């Protein structure tokens, strides 16, 4: 089990690549513990080797799966208090902003 060892804890979704990866990397460089969530299992495995266990813990899954999110948050909460959520993961949508229903963004 990873330990945050007194560090602030951030959850970064979409952490495997791109902006999510860079946000996670920057937080780790500033002394944060990052719980990275992404569906890219191969890349998450690489990141688990790149960063130390007291810097990063990978969670592989889809944030649209409510049970996955609940289980991940429960596991992260056992590491320590969650100080920051960067909800970077998303699904492309091609609607104009006024065409969204509440269920689309829930």
Which residues make up each language-model segment?
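Canonical Rossmann dinucleotide-binding motif of NAD(H)/NADP(H)-dependent dehydrogenases/reductases
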Residues: 2-33
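Rossmann-fold scaffold of SDR-type NAD(P)-dependent oxidoreductases
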Residues: 13, 82-90
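Flexible cofactor-recognition loop at the NAD(P)H-binding site
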Residues: 17, 90-93
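Conserved glycine-rich Rossmann-like NAD(P)H-binding loop of the short-chain dehydrogenase/reductase
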Residues: 30-46
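The beta1-alpha1 cofactor-binding region of Rossmann-like NAD(H)/NADP(H)-dependent oxidoreductases
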Residues: 42, 60-71, 102
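Short, conserved SAM-binding/catalytic segment
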Residues: 47-53
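Conserved mid-core segment of classical short-chain dehydrogenase/reductases
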Residues: 70, 92-106
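Glycine-rich phosphate-binding loop signature in dinucleotide/nucleotide-binding domains
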Residues: 75-80
């Amino acid at each position: 089990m990873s330990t945050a060892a007194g560090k602030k804890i951030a959850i970064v979704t979409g952490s495997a690549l791109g902006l999510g990866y860079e946000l996670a990397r920057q937080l780790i460089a500033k002394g944060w513990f990052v719980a990275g969530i992404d569906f890219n299992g191969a890349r998450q495995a690489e990141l688990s080797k790149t960063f130390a266990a007291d810097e990063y813990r990978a969670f592989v899954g889809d944030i649209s799966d409510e049970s996955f999110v609940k289980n991940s948050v429960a596991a992260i909460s056992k590491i320590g208090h969650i100080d920051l959520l960067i909800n970077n993961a998303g699904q492309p949508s091609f609607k104009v902003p006024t065409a969204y229903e509440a269920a689309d963004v829930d």
